[in-house]
Regions:
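Charge-dense, helix-prone N-terminal extensions
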Residues: 1-122
Length: 122
């Protein structure tokens, strides 16, 4: 099976069912609200946002979840330790199940925290 190469975030979104597209569009809107200077890119064949040379956050959709991805810092994992217990989490991804409401406030908090980290690194 050939790997699909997307040219932009709209093309990525269009390859998923409408309900998933809406969730991804919500995440995209959150990022733009919190980090209006972030640049939209496709990296590793998934949507991502950069501030300068640094990646703010990635997201990707799967059959049963949407992943928020980044190399999560120890500080971020510690700050959101309690909230993260509700999700499957790895060193680089937080899985948001499609059968549950999208945790908008939590996503906003993560993006704000990541923005602080990225700005501090520049």
């Amino acid at each position: 099976m050939a790997k699909i190469t997307y040219t932009d975030i709209d093309a990525y979104h269009a390859s998923f069912p409408e309900e998933v597209q809406e969730r991804m569009q919500t995440i995209r809107g959150i990022v733009h609200k919190i980090a209006p200077d972030a640049e939209e890119v496709i990296s590793y064949s998934i949507p991502a946002f950069k501030i300068g040379k640094h990646f703010l956050i990635y997201y990707s959709a799967y059959a049963k979840h949407i992943s928020l991805s980044s190399p999560w810092s120890a500080a971020l994992l510690a700050k959101f330790e309690v909230e993260l217990t509700a999700y499957k989490v790895s060193k680089s991804a937080i899985q948001l199940p499609l059968d549950k409401d999208l945790p908008v406030k939590f996503i906003e908090q993560i993006v704000k925290f990541r923005k602080q980290e990225v700005v501090a690194a520049t």
